[in-house]
Amino acid sequence: MRAIISVANREGLKELARALQSQNATIFSTTGTAGALKAKGIEVEPVSALTGFPEILDGRVKTLHPAIFAGILARREIEAHLHDLQEHDIAPIDMVAVNLYPFADTIARPDATFSEALEQIDIGGVSLIRAAAKNFQDVIVLVRPQDYAPVMQELQEKGRVSFDTRRRLAPVDDVIAVDQGNRHCRAGLGHRHGLGRHRRLVAIAIGHLRRHRRGAIGECDRIG
C-alpha cells in the first residue's frame, strides 16, 4: 500500500501512520507533515520521491505533478490505465489522507490581511481530495481525523476497506455541490452589501476550495 499524507490538522496523525506501518504501507508526505512524522520516529518518504521534483515556491507547489495524480486517478481495472502507469514508471496510490490549510480560521481573525488569507488558500490539498474522491473505488480518502481509526480497524480486520466505506468517506457529493454552487456564489456575492473587493475574492475562493463536508451554497450564506 502507498499512502500520501499531507495534513494541516495533526490530530490522530501519529496513530494513523503507525497503523499504516503495521500494514507495511509506504507513507509519502509533504515537508511539514513529514517533519511531524519523523519527530515521532515514523519512517516517511518525501513526495519528491514520487515526483522526482523538489517542492518549490516556498511550498506553493508540492504535489501538483502527473506522477502523483496519475497514481491516484488510474482505474485499476482498466488495462490501458495500468499500461500508462507502467510506461511512465508511476506507482499507484492507495490512500490519500489530506486536510486543508486553516483558511476559515485565518479570515475570521480581525487582524488578518488579504495577503495572509491568500496564502491559506489550499491548492494542492483540494486537488488531491478531488482526485481521490473521483477514484474512490481504488483510493481510500481520509479528510477527517475521526475517520482514521475506524478505517484502519476495518483494514486490519478484513484486509481491505469496503466499497460502502470508501463511498461514505469520499466527499463526492461535496465536489459536485461546490462545482454547481460556484455560479450561485459568483452571482450573489457581488451584490452583498459590506463586502469589499478583496472580501469578495476571498469569499469566492471559499466556494471553490473549502472541502469540509458542507455544501457551497451553505458556505456562501455563511459568508454573507
Language-model regions, residue ranges each:
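General beta-strand structural signal in soluble alpha/beta enzymes
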Residues: I5, T26-T31, E45-A49, A74, ...
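Internal alpha/beta core interface subdomains
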Residues: I90-R186
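Short, intrinsically disordered C-terminal tails of secreted or membrane-associated proteins
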Residues: A216-I223
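Short linear motifs in low-complexity or flexible loops
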Residues: A187, A203-A205, G215-A216
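Intrinsic disorder/low-complexity segments
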Residues: Q180-R183, G207-R211, R222
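Glycine-rich nucleotide/cofactor/substrate-binding loop typically near the N-terminus or early
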Residues: G32-F103
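N-terminal glycine-/serine-/threonine-rich phosphate-binding loop
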Residues: M1-L50
